[in-house]
């Protein structure tokens, strides 16, 4: 066994960097926190090539003297705390004194700083942990730190960095969080010479959200304020029904620090259980405050996670506060929802269309909120919900088309043939699928509007209508994408979309791909876009929500950028969910047609997400269940 020895400061700093500096965004985080702790009211962040080649953070904070600038590069040197008890009354973002020496050990690190009362500033240059020079420089009060060639001295770490685009998205997200945490501080963010956002000092959180996320997002929020037993919950939360496809706009702060808190996140999700659709996440920018001694911010190397001393109490408080606010919103709405005798809707004459393009005797909508008329036998059961309030569309020829009747497919969309598709010879062996519906399949009934029950000579078949439709649509769209023949409908009134800077950058990088697959999306100013055409299978009302969900998939990394075929498959998977429109009333012929279409696909056993489309209960299984 080798002898025990004390590591050099350079090696120790590089090891610490592995814990604290995991990617370029972590560098930006540490430098922005230092700027805020220095009392800065203006912070500018600039980076290039995802932070690999350059990151620069400049502030107008208090600055440092020459001695402090050199001491800040020593391990565990900090001005934030002086004893362990200070952790129980922590009022700063940083406190360990590890960040600057760790960053300097794995990069080319240049620091320029000047404190008030000094005639000249100080410049310190460190390369790979080695001090190159210390000299005077001219600069205004404040600090500028430039980090270049990150991880050049540690190639093993550099090769694990993601693409420039991914690393840039993390940096933008980081700066955005601290801009939200401190609305009174002006923030600028520049990527490769392009301004991502520039937000002046904002008097309110709502104005900062409008600057960063867009006015549309800000208008979807309502304030929340609750105080109880030394805990305070403030900020802005989404109105009932307003949800997002990802958690990127469910942001929590603990004592002004942006954190990932399972306790707070799950409390928000539980509070909105009945207020947002299933599979969606609430929109929230909430600030939780408590005694610093009641929360531990020292449980994670990068201080991303916190631990509460009494987590059940915190969770209950947040749930009660949010539910109470949502009830207040609902009660306020109900005050305006009561129609008077003067403005009650007048009865229509028989056969006359009712308001919103529906007839009085139309069947009630399914739980999905869509009424429909089934297709004739032999056609796939899909519906549309175009009404008088829907946006009309233009065919490619330019002629205005009326609203599609419920259940009618656009004529340009080819139907899947009834004949089964061949299975690849080299495919892995799978259980033989059931035979398509035949006269021996006796339709029993439809349960809960979605599950079709068939009786066969072998037992019972329970078919999930939605899952079956998704599989059929998935393979239909895949075929369209492969052939390049994607019919689209041009909108008479383009749909305006305002995005946050990250989403806008992601969309710009992929807009050409989307335009080749049925969309027409055009940039219309900074972070503004117009959807001018959508695929024929999509209703115009779904265009903006679908685009936002798609951008959420981009941001989560669920999008293969380098493989066009995989990208088309992912687009078809997301689109198949939106394309399905379940009619409220379905007959036996329509269900048999659906089964025929399902077994004409390559993988009829599951939907695109891998869930089963049907369940077979044979006689043996039924006997076992009934203990015969």
Swiss-Prot record:
InterPro entries recorded: DNA_mismatch_repair_CS (IPR014762), DNA_mismatch_repair_MutL (IPR020667), DNA_mismatch_S5_2-like (IPR013507), HATPase_C_sf (IPR036890), MutL/Mlh/PMS (IPR002099), MutL/Mlh/Pms-like (IPR038973), MutL_C (IPR014790), MutL_C_dimsub (IPR042120)
Chain spans, region Disordered: 334-367
This protein's GO CC annotations: mismatch repair complex
An individual GO BP term: mismatch repair
GO MF annotations in UniProt: ATP binding; ATP hydrolysis activity; ATP-dependent DNA damage sensor activity; mismatched DNA binding
Keywords attached to this entry: DNA damage, DNA repair
Superkingdom of origin organism: Bacteria
SUPFAM superfamilies (alphabetical): ATPase domain of HSP90 chaperone/DNA topoisomerase II/histidine kinase, DNA mismatch repair protein MutL, Ribosomal protein S5 domain 2-like
Database matches in CDD domains: HATPase_MutL-MLH-PMS-like, MutL_Trans
Biased composition (Basic and acidic residues): 357-367
Family to which the UniProt record says this protein belongs: Belongs to the DNA mismatch repair MutL/HexB family.
Entries under NCBIfam families matching the protein: mutl (TIGR00585)
Biological function: This protein is involved in the repair of mismatches in DNA. It is required for dam-dependent methyl-directed DNA mismatch repair. May act as a 'molecular matchmaker', a protein that promotes the formation of a stable complex between two or more DNA-binding proteins in an ATP-dependent manner without itself being part of a final effector complex.
Name the record gives this protein: DNA mismatch repair protein MutL
Organism: Opitutus terrae (strain DSM 11246 / JCM 15787 / PB90-1)
